[in-house]
Structures are given as C-alpha cells and as structure tokens.
Regions:
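Bacterial signal peptide processing site
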Residues: 22-24
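C-terminal motif of bacterial Sec signal peptides marking the signal peptidase cleavage site
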Residues: 17-20
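A cross-family detector of function-defining hotspots
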Residues: 27-29, 34, 46, 53-95, ...
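Acidic/histidine-rich, surface-exposed loop or edge segments in extracytoplasmic proteins
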Residues: 35-43, 100-109
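Glycine-rich loop/hinge motif
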Residues: 48, 112-113
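Bacterial N-terminal signal peptides that target proteins for export
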Residues: 1-8
C-alpha cells in the first residue's frame, strides 16, 4: 500500500516534468564548451553594437524606434524598427540603458560580414568559418558562433531550404 501511494504521488510529477521538456529544443549553452571561439567583436547594425547605449540606437539609425515595449520583470525595453511589432526590420533589447541583444528579420540590415536574411547556410559558413554549432529550436535549424573573448553570440535561423530567416546577436551572460 505504501509503494502504491508513493507511485501515485511521484508518477504525475514525472509526467509533468517530461511534458515540460521540448525534445526538439537544445539550449545553446550546451555547445559553449565544445565550440571554438570566433571573433565577433565588430558585429553591429549601423554602428550600434552590443554594449552601445540606448541613445546610440536612435542616433546611429537616424530615427526613433517605431515601437517601444517595456517589460517590468526582468526589467528591459525593446526598441523596434519596422512596419509592426511582428514584421520588423531590427529589434534591440535594452537592459540597464545598454544594448544586450538585437534581432534582424529583414534584408534591410546585414551583419558585419555582409550576411542578410535570404542568404544561404553556405554563405554564413563562408563568412564566419567552420567553428559553429548547430541545433534545433521550435522546428527551425539554428547555426551559431561564440566569441568567448568578447562574450558574444550570433545565431542564424534557417528555413527548410537552408536560407537565413533571422539573425540574433547577443551578449553571453556566463
């Protein structure tokens, strides 16, 4: 009887734990130690890089963001440039008045090495080199690079034809 009551208590907890895990999604941190470093120090969008001040964003892009979203917990602000919050060109995450991340989902902007949305996986590897990791996240293939010296990460989201759909550059917090 005692085993049965333990089983009835523990079994639902195990099911809940398994249900909350997405087997198709592997966190990028898993690849950090096994991926060689790539220099990403010069990555920027119109001279705005990770660590730039929030004031540099509007100044360098020569316009104010079209949309601003404020999140209270954890505190950060998102500056969005584009037609809408869903169909944007570039989005900057501002934490403590500094850029901590930016996303590109249109070909209007490119990486420092000239990669735009629509470019191929081969173009990315030609520009950034062979020291990348590859993972799946919510059905998309992601290839990424770490700059361990400057604590930066860049990821390229690929569609089913291995074309770049989106680009994420962010500060590494480890």
């Amino acid at each position: 009887m005692r085993i049965k009551s333990h089983f009835l208590f523990i079994f639902p907890l195990i099911l809940l734990l398994l249900a909350s895990c997405d087997p198709s999604s592997t966190p990028k941190e898993k690849y950090y130690s096994s991926t060689k470093t790539t220099n990403l120090e010069l990555e920027n969008v119109k001279s705005v890089s990770i660590g730039s001040s929030k004031y540099d964003v509007a100044s360098c892009l020569r316009k104010k963001p079209k949309f601003i979203e404020v999140t209270e917990q954890p505190p950060y602000t998102t500056y969005i440039y584009g037609k809408s919050t869903e169909k944007y060109d570039v989005e900057f995450k501002i934490v403590a008045n500094q850029v901590s991340r930016y996303d590109l989902i249109s070909s209007k902007y490119s990486t420092e090495k000239g990669i735009h949305t629509g470019d191929s996986k081969k173009d990315v590897i030609r520009a950034y080199g062979e020291n990348y990791y590859e993972r799946e996240d919510t059905g998309a293939t992601i290839i990424g690079y770490f700059d361990k010296n400057h604590k930066l990460n860049i990821e390229f989201s690929l569609d089913d034809k291995d074309k770049v759909e989106g680009i994420l550059v962010q500060k590494i917090n480890n």
